[in-house]
Structure formats: structure tokens, C-alpha cells
Amino acid sequence: SEADETFHFEGVLSMHWKDPRLAFDPAVTGYDDLYYQGYYQFNEVFTGWWPQVFLANEAGGFEQQGIVLRITPDGNVYYTEEIEAVAKSHFNLARYPFDRQQLAAIFEVLGFESEEVVLRVDPASSGIWDDDEHKVEIPQWYSPKLSSSVVEYGPSYLDGRDGHLSAFRVQIDVERDPRYTLRLVGFPVIIFVILSWSVFWMDRSSVGDRMDITFMGILTVVAYQIMFSGSLPKISYPTILG
């Protein structure tokens, strides 16, 4: 939503850490890897530690739809979870409909500072689907580009203490395809304005006709703007289209 400066996204949250306390001997257990599937097994059966990640810039929704936890014999833990969320991110629409946006989702670990838990980017599990069958396409936008990074920052608490937190930032760079907006709003308004300018080439003695054309042009542009106002972003500052 451009008016609320929010965006909706779906994705897979993948994490990997090592906990030697969870190591086991396959010859004793009889299995090579240990799996916990679904929230019942994860919440009720799994007894190890895991980083509880939350969306710091959440704006109205963060749903967890499926989870798989895999533990290898040496204590490596692989956490995979499907998520759907709405995040708050700054929109700059001054160049609408030729604008570009940087949408960011910021994840943090609940209850731990960077001295205890440090987040790192894993290039092997970070990316966006780009094949023909699963390619991400957004109406009125060109194909998005994804990047990720770790941000370190220090919040100040009311008792004067400075904290040190680590956050995982996922950034989606998108560029708007202006053709729909120009075809629907931009080009028709330009034609109406040009027709209104035709009064300057009319006979000077035809004052009444010139006034009629001018008022008709103004009313047509205003009516057209009102008719298609729902297709334009509801923001207070001006854009290229007005």
C-alpha cells in the first residue's frame, strides 16, 4: 500500500547454526539426520535452543505457515520456515510513475544482543526465484532484485545503557512500469490540455467559443482526474502526474 507505506511479501526463512549439545551418533540412533516437521513437533518435541526471529518493521501481519527443522550428527541445525508478512518501508513517490523503491524487511533475534547472537548472511540460501515456472512477477512493476545484509546498531535505553543489536536486512529493489498509468491517465490528460490550447489559434472575435472550449477542457481534465483518482497513489506531496 503506497498510502500506508507498506508492502506484502511471502518467502522462506532459512537459518543455520551449530549446537554441539544436539550431536548424536547415527550408529546408536539408527538414523542419519533428525527431523522435526510441523509446529507440533517443533514446539512440543524439540528441546534444543533456537533463535526466535521476528520482523522488526512488521505492519499488521506476520504469519508462519510451515516449518522443518533438520539436525545432522555433528550438531548442525537447519531451520526452514514459510512466512507471509506485511512490512513498513519508506516510499518516495515524487517521480511517480517513473519511481523506484527500495523495500526492506528487517529481521532481529528476540531477547539477544549482538554479543550473544550474531546474524550472518548465507549466500547459499539467499535469493529470489528466477526460473520460468516460479519467476516473481508483480503487476505494474518490473522484475524485482533482491539483496541481503547484516546491520549492526545500538539502541539507547531509558536507564542510559547502550545496546548492541544485530539485524538481518532483506532489500527488494523494484522499478515501476509506467505504461499502464500513462495509458490510463497521462496521455489522455495531455490530449485534453492540447485541445484546450487550441483557443490561442482561434479567431480573436470568437470570444464566446474560446471561453466555452477553455471551460470544457478544464472540466474534462478535472472529471477525468476524479474518475481515475483510485488508480493514483493517495499521498499529500506532488508527483510528476500532479
What does each of the following model-derived ranges do?
Residues 1-169:
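Soluble non-transmembrane domains of integral membrane proteins
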Residues 169-242:
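Channel- or pocket-lining gating/hinge segments that regulate access to a cavity or pore
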